[in-house]
């Protein structure tokens, strides 16, 4: 399964986290976020895929960040349209959706065959990083073909919940606020312990 850690900014923290063998690392380029990345860190990850998170940014702004930060994947976390997402090809694109109930899953249909991945997050007061989970059983109603990552308040005590969750399209999890010492500063030890406990038993 894919392990994505989002909301990274500190160079030393990035370097330490990369050593854990995670797969994707996210950086947030939305100025209203407490994890906003305003300048290129002194160290950028080299052995993981770099994910840039954008919220209703312009096409020009996204392309500039992709080039400046050498991003591998673009995550759209706002109200971006299917046409906007399609215009970002050939880059890989994640479209995030805030989920509270089955009705919220209907919005995914317009993006099928356009984006590469979905990310299902908790519907909260702010965009991402709320630290709250939604009812994952809602995702039983998702019958799309696009693979997705499970997000929203996954924390150190959720190993069993992650193990127990099964969906044929779920390919990974997204970790953020509940593993933080401060905004954009991850507790690498707790992430290591979580991954050790999770081990490779999920989806075997």
Pin down the residues of each PLM region:
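Conserved N-terminal beta1-alpha1 strand-loop-helix module at the mouth
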Residues: 1-204
């Amino acid at each position: 399964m894919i392990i994505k850690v989002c909301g990274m900014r500190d160079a030393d923290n990035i370097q330490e986290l990369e050593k854990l063998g995670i797969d994707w690392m996210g950086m947030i380029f939305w100025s209203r976020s407490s994890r906003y990345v305003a300048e290129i860190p002194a160290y950028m990850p080299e052995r993981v895929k770099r994910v840039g998170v954008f919220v209703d940014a312009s096409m020009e702004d996204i392309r500039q960040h992709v080039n400046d930060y050498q991003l591998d994947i673009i995550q759209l976390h706002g109200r971006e349209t299917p046409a906007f997402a399609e215009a970002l090809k050939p880059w890989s694109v994640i479209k995030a959706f805030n989920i509270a109930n089955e009705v919220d899953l209907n919005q995914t249909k317009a993006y099928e065959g356009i984006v590469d991945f979905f990310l299902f997050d908790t519907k909260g007061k702010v965009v991402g990083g709320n630290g709250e989970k939604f009812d994952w059983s809602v995702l039983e109603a998702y019958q799309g073909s696009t693979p997705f990552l499970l997000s929203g308040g996954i924390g150190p005590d959720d190993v069993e919940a992650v193990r127990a969750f099964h969906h044929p399209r779920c390919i990974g999890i997204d970790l953020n606020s509940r593993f933080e010492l401060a905004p954009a500063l991850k507790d690498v030890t707790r992430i290591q312990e979580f991954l050790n406990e999770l081990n490779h038993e999920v989806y075997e």
